[in-house]
C-alpha cells in the first residue's frame, strides 16, 4: 500500500496531487486496469506480439532517411 505523509499546514489538494503522482510513477493504475478482467494467455501473447511489431516498425521508420521534399 502506498502512503504519503501529509506535511504540517499542507493543503489537501497538494497532498492528493503528490499521492496521485506516486501512484502514477509506480504504475499501479495501469496494472490494476490490466488485471481488471481475465485475459486468456493466447490473447495476451497476441497483444504483446502486436505491440512489439508496432514498436519495431516505429523504430525502423525513425531510422530511415526522410524523403526528398521536392
From Swiss-Prot:
One GO BP: translation
GO molecular function: structural constituent of ribosome
InterPro entries: Ribosomal_bS21 (IPR001911), Ribosomal_bS21_CS (IPR018278), Ribosomal_bS21_sf (IPR038380)
This protein's GO CC annotations: ribonucleoprotein complex; ribosome
Keywords: Ribonucleoprotein, Ribosomal protein
Transmembrane segments: none
Family, per entry: Belongs to the bacterial ribosomal protein bS21 family.
HAMAP family per record: Ribosomal_bS21
PANTHER family xrefs: MITOCHONDRIAL 28S RIBOSOMAL PROTEIN S21 (PTHR21109), SMALL RIBOSOMAL SUBUNIT PROTEIN BS21 (PTHR21109:SF22)
NCBIfam families in UniProt: S21p (TIGR00030)
Annotated protein name in UniProt: Small ribosomal subunit protein bS21
Native organism: Acidovorax ebreus (strain TPSY)
Protein's gene: rpsU
Amino acid at each position: 500500500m502506498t502512503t504519503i505523509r501529509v506535511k504540517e499546514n499542507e493543503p489537501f489538494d497538494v497532498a492528493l496531487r503528490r499521492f496521485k503522482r506516486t501512484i502514477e510513477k509506480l504504475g499501479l493504475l495501469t496494472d490494476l486496469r490490466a488485471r481488471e478482467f481475465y485475459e486468456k494467455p493466447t490473447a495476451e501473447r497476441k497483444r504483446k506480439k502486436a505491440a512489439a511489431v508496432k514498436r519495431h516498425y516505429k523504430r525502423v521508420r525513425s531510422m530511415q532517411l526522410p524523403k526528398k521534399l521536392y
